Each structure stands twice: as C-alpha cells, then as structure tokens.
C-alpha cells in the first residue's frame, strides 16, 4: 500500500508553528477592531460563474489556476481563488449594500490556486481580506491604506515594506489606453516574451506587469496610462497622494502597477518588500466601484485589499519579529491513579476557577518518579502532588520545580488562593 502524503502545494501547520499564526491573527483582529471593521466568514466553494464574471475570463487566475469541479447535481463549482468576489456575492445576496448602506468587513481563510509551488506561493494559501462598501470619497481610500500601514507598524516591519500606487482610471479610460498600447506594441510583436504575446489578445494591460527585462525595455517608451485618465480621477489620485504625505505614509508611484484581477478601477496599490525574493508583494488592493452592479447588485462604491498571510509570516520570521514560543504550562499535577475520582475533581475545579492557568498532567498516571520527570520536561513552575496520603491529610504537596526548595504543603481549600499569588 502506497504511503499517504500531503497534496503538493498544500501545507500542514504543525503544533510547534501554530503559535505564529495565533500571534499574527491576534494582531490582525486588534487593528481591525480599532477601525471598527466587522468579521464575516465566507464559504470556500462558490459557483464558477462568480469568478468568470468578476475576476475575468481572460485573467491568469480563471484561465489557468482555478480548481474547478462539478458536484453530483452537475453544477460547476470552484474552490475560491480569492475572497473579494465571494464577499460581494454575500453583500448582494443579503442586501447589505442597498439604499445607501455602508459596510466595513474583513475575513481570513484559505484560498486555492493551481500554481507552481515555491517559497511564499502555495496552492492553498491563507489570505486576509478587508473590504468596504458604499463609501465614495477619498477618506475610505486613505483608511484602508492606513489599516495596512497600522498593521505593519504594530508588527514592527513598517520600515521593510514599500507602498506602490497607481490609478487605472475608468473603464472607458482603460479601453482608450489599451488601443494606444496595442498600436505601440505592433512593431515589437516578435520581440515580446511568450506570456505577453498571449496577453495581447486577452488582457493587454497585464503586459505592463511583465517581469521580463526585454519586455520592460520595450515598454519604457510606451504610452502612459495616466495620460488617458479623466481630469477628475487624475485630481483625485493627486489628492490621495497629498493626504498620504500628510499622514506620513511613505509611497512611490508605479505606472506599471495594473493588478491581475479585471474588476479594479481607479486607485490600485501594493505593499512590497525586498526581503522575500521574487514573491515581493505582501498586500495588494484597490477600488472596484463597478463590481457590485456587474454581479447583479445596486451600483455601489467599493474598495479593499488582501494580505498573503504565509508571506507576511515569512517576512516576520526573516526579520526576527515573531515572539518566542512558550509551550510551558504553569502547573503540573502529579496524581495517584487509584484515587482519580477525587483528585481529578480537584484539578477540574481549579481549571474552572483559574482559567488563565495552563494546567497539565501525565494522563498515563505512571509512577510518581516518572510523573515528576514529565513535570520537569513540561517547563511548569510548580508541581502539585495529590496522592493517597495527601487526600487523607487534606493537604496537597507543592514542589517548585525551578527552585531548590523543600516540598511544601497547602490545604486543598487554600489551593486556589495559593495559585492566584
């Protein structure tokens, strides 16, 4: 029989690593509570049509990377490759953005893309999503950027990340620019890399995002998207930059930043780092003001961003910003297996009365000698002994494991007071 192993591109979070996730998730919740965003929990499976209509048929994600399948009813379903589309579907289906309502939401969970696995890029990956609906003005643009900035400051990594900004303008602006870009690239068709040639027919703007040096040299003299953007949108983008200056948020303009999802409009941004090699983007987002009505809802202003949690953890680890793991328990009980009905009741009462304590014991209940060895290995500060003699006398034995002191005795009815000290 063949050995069962994990699916390629998927990862187990082992017990020794789970504290890293708990640390990061606690910081995420701290920041989002500060900005009064509400958590939502979304299904990992959606109808395939949702992503075709939102992310885009021609996008790399939909055309090459989604996990698609049919259920027993013949419905075409997809493991979610990103979270925004599902969040918009939820908002529409539950009438959360009608009649001028506003929503500030966040979620965190696994996403799935069939990509070549490498460090920081996996086929199942966890993503934090932050989404806001019903806000038209610049203030919400600044707030979502400030949320990411605040998280990076809370984690102690703000000096190692860079905010990159661009504006994609309106859909009409992009159509006009796309025609100008195609016209410019015509003479260079044979010199473009293979992926860029494919994008000429499907999604020409994505050529701007090419990492191939030769293609980037060709693009150096290409028309600039900013020159095709309406005056009002250009002014809004300029004002956004001015406000970021006032807030003290460092940024740089990136004219080639276009994002890989078709639903973005207006402002787009990424937070990047030079500490993770080719997987430099750790946060990306922007406005998607047309997506809600494209999916059947009322026209609703919308903006959001996503953070790759694994990449963020890799960065924290690389920079030494993760706390040391503390698996040590506070109290280790050493019990007589012949008297468990009494001693376990005492232990459980203490757990209920002092829930902040980490309490452990040897559930195999070997000899006292073997239990003391396990107590020493547990890292506990104190061992509490409850054997037949202790039960007969009404006193628990107390041994401070990290100090060279004689064993003490404490009456059972004083144990809670003793442990609270």
Curated annotation (Swiss-Prot):
* Primary subcellular site in the record, as a coarse category: cytoplasm
Record keywords: Transferase included?
A: no
EC number(s) per UniProt? 6.1.1.21
Which CDD domains does this entry report, sorted A to Z? HisRS-like_core
The answer, when asked if Protein biosynthesis is one of the entry's keywords, is yes
Q: Name one Pfam family in it.
A: tRNA-synt_His
Q: Name one GO molecular function term.
A: histidine-tRNA ligase activity
Q: Give compartment(s).
A: Cytoplasm
Q: Which SUPFAM superfamilies match?
A: Class II aaRS ABD-related, Class II aaRS and biotin synthetases
Renumbered to this chain, the signal peptide range is none
What are its GO biological-process terms? histidyl-tRNA aminoacylation
Task: Provide the reaction this enzyme catalyses.
Answer: tRNA(His) + L-histidine + ATP = L-histidyl-tRNA(His) + AMP + diphosphate + H(+)
First-tier enzyme category under EC: ligase
Q: Which Gene3D superfamilies does the protein's record reference?
A: Anticodon-binding domain (3.40.50.800), Bira Bifunctional Protein, Domain 2 (3.30.930.10)
Sorted alphabetically, the keyword list is:
Aminoacyl-tRNA synthetase, ATP-binding, Cytoplasm, Ligase, Nucleotide-binding, Protein biosynthesis
Q: A single GO CC term, please?
A: cytoplasm
- Disulfide connectivity? none
**Superkingdom, taxonomy of origin:** Bacteria
| Subunit relationships | Homodimer.
Per the record, the similarity remark reads: Belongs to the class-II aminoacyl-tRNA synthetase family.
What protein is this chain from?
Histidine--tRNA ligase
């Amino acid at each position: 029989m063949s050995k069962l192993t994990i699916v390629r591109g998927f990862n187990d979070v082992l017990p020794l690593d789970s504290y890293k996730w708990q640390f990061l998730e606690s910081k995420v919740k701290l920041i989002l509570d500060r900005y009064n965003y509400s958590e939502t929990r979304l299904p990992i499976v959606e109808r395939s049509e949702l992503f075709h209509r939102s992310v885009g048929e021609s996008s790399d994600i939909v055309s090459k990377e989604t996990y698609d399948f049919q259920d027993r009813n013949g419905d075409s379903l997809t493991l979610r490759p990103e979270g925004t589309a599902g969040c918009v579907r939820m908002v529409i289906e539950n009438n959360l953005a009608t009649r001028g309502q506003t929503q500030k939401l966040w979620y965190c969970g696994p996403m799935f893309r069939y990509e070549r696995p490498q460090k920081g890029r996996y086929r199942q990956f966890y993503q934090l999503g932050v989404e806001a609906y019903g806000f038209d003005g610049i203030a919400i643009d600044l707030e979502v950027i400030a949320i990411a900035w605040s998280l990076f400051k809370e984690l102690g990594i703000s000096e190692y990340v860079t905010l990159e900004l661009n504006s994609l303008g309106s859909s009409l602006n992009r159509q006009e620019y796309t025609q100008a870009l195609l016209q410019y690239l015509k003479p260079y068709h044979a010199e473009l890399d293979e992926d860029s040639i494919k994008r000429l027919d499907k999604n020409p703007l994505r050529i701007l995002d090419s990492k191939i040096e030769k293609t980037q040299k060709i693009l150096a003299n290409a028309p600039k998207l900013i020159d095709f953007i309406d005056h009002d949108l250009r002014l809004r983008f300029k004002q956004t930059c001015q406000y970021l200056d006032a807030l003290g948020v460092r940024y740089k303009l990136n004219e080639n930043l276009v994002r890989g999802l078709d639903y973005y409009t207006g402002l787009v941004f990424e937070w990047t780092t030079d500490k993770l090699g080719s997987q430099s983007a750790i946060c990306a987002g922007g406005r998607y003001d047309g997506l809600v009505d494209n999916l059947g809802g009322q026209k609703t202003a919308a903006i959001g961003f996503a953070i790759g949690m694994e990449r963020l953890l890799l960065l924290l680890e690389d920079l030494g910003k993760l706390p040391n793991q503390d698996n040590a328990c506070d109290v280790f009980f050493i019990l007589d297996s012949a008297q468990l009905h009494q001693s376990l009741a005492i232990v459980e009462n203490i757990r209920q009365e002092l829930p902040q304590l980490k309490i452990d014991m040897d559930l195999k209940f070997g000899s006292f000698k073997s239990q003391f060895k396990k107590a020493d290995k547990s890292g506990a500060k104190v061992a509490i002994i409850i054997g037949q003699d202790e039960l007969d006398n009404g006193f628990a034995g107390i041994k401070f494991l990290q100090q060279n002191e004689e064993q003490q005795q404490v009456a059972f009815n004083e144990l809670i007071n003793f442990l609270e000290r």
